[in-house]
């Protein structure tokens, strides 16, 4: 008789694709690998990943692992949560459009709906996610699992809340300004002073020694961003002339 694993996850839509997984040593390795990658996703990453799963409808655990390694192939627009906001975003991004033409096309909702009809994609609590023209790479072919940190660049994960500590959100750092704004919008706050930090987790243990004092999430993100950029610059190869 084959044992079966029932997977629970905070990732939207994931459970229905991993509801019953036949247990084997290989499957447990794959589940453990996926669990590590999910561990370093924040609230927005989870929403995007769940949306990608819903759009792509993976058939196997291998497919889901490959999706987790191809997240950069999907387009995420933080804060774009309605057809109206999508239409506004698309027009703002087209700086070459004449003012008269923009005025004629100022039906933002219609523009957003037309775009979705042509390109697909779905809205979620934090924004809009759609596919791209790039082909997905088969990073995992069923034999050797890829690097668990493949294309995951966060250094810290912060838990924040407003009001009830059990109703918390997570944010991985460094984060872009648009991603931070999308989280504030989802939390219903205008600035970071309106929320409190519940916990912080460090991906690389040695970074605990580096972590300086900070007065806000925004300041911490600036410090982490600067530190990561400095590390990247030191790792860049020097070309000999």
Predicted features, each with a name:
Residues 1-40, 170, 174-223:
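N-terminal interaction modules that seed assembly of large macromolecular complexes
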Residues 66, 75-155, 160-168:
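Extended, well-ordered protein cores
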Residues 107, 239-241:
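Non-Sec secretion/translocation targeting segments of pathogen effectors
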Residues 24, 43, 59-62, 97-98, ...:
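Extracellular/secreted glycoprotein ectodomains characterized by long, lumenal stretches
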């Amino acid at each position: 008789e084959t044992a079966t694993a029932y997977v629970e996850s905070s990732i939207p839509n994931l459970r229905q694709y991993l509801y019953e997984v036949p247990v084997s040593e290989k499957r447990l390795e794959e589940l453990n690998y996926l669990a590590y990658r999910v561990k370093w996703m924040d609230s927005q990453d989870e929403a995007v990943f769940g949306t990608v799963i819903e759009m792509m409808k993976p058939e196997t655990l291998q497919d889901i692992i490959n999706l987790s390694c191809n997240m950069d192939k999907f387009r995420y627009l933080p804060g774009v949560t309605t057809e109206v906001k999508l239409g506004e975003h698309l027009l703002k991004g087209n700086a070459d459009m004449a003012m008269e033409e923009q005025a004629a096309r100022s039906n933002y909702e219609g523009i957003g709906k037309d775009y979705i009809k042509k390109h697909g994609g779905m809205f979620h609590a934090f924004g809009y996610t759609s596919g791209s023209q790039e082909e997905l790479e088969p990073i995992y072919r069923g034999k050797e699992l890829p690097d668990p940190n493949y294309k995951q660049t966060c250094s810290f994960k912060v838990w924040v809340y407003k009001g009830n500590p059990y109703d918390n959100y997570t944010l991985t750092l460094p984060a872009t300004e648009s991603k931070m704004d999308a989280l504030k919008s989802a939390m219903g706050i205008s600035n970071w002073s309106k929320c409190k930090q519940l916990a912080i987790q460090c991906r690389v243990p040695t970074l605990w020694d580096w972590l300086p004092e900070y007065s806000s999430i925004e300041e911490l993100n600036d410090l982490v961003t600067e530190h990561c950029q400095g590390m990247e610059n030191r790792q860049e190869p020097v070309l000999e002339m």
